[in-house]
Amino acid sequence: MRRAAGSTSRFAAGLIAGTSRRGVAVGHGYARFDNDVLALTPRGAPRMPNGIETDVVLTVGEQLLIGDGQFCTASAILIAGPPWEARPSPRVALTIRPDANLAFDQLSGWGPGLTPLGDDILVGYTAAAALAGAPPTPAASWGDRTTALSRTLLALAALGELPEPAHRLLEDGNPQPLLRFGSTSGKGIIVGLAAAPASTATVCDGRFTVALSLPDGPQTFEVFLSEVEC
């Protein structure tokens, strides 16, 4: 019997509505369909721009089918649930000190993990450019040099779409959910967001620190929060 998933990102809804495709579960709640990676997150967990909320748990290597209006796993057939908007509406601008001076072309694929730290920084930087209406970053080129998951997230960041904890920072000025997101993923996204050219903003009304190990060695940044001018 088919059942509706929880909230569903634009990306996931597109996969479900699209042409039928076979895929495989790759672990940690991710399913790969060619170069597209879908995230399955339980209700209450941070939502992902490539995600769908569901209590379905995948087994590594499990064969999957998506498209023609449904997502078929070994244990369930899901249809898209209510839409979740993965593109935040920023009310907070970020600036960073000292200047990050990051060699962006060297960050793609740098670091361990499903989403290497370098890619997390690029996701934040790419999304910040998209949200500010700035010239686009070479996200597609960066994505060609890293994991399929990072490639998917970079493509979505180019549309301004980000994991839910980033919404809390950009919309509410609350950095804590993003600081707690993943081992270093959230911190990397913060540095990328703050390293992008800042929107016009009022005076600073908050700050916090982010410590990361970067290609040049450990660095500690201070991130300043300001209300975006309307």
What are these regions (language model features)?
Residues M1-L122, A129-P136, A140, D144-H167, ...:
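Phosphate/adenylate-binding glycine loop and adjacent helical scaffold
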Residues T126-L131, A195-S199:
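Short glycine/serine- and small hydrophobic-enriched flexible loop segments
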Residues K187, A194-V203:
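Helix-coil modules at protein/domain termini and other flexible surface or pore-lining loops
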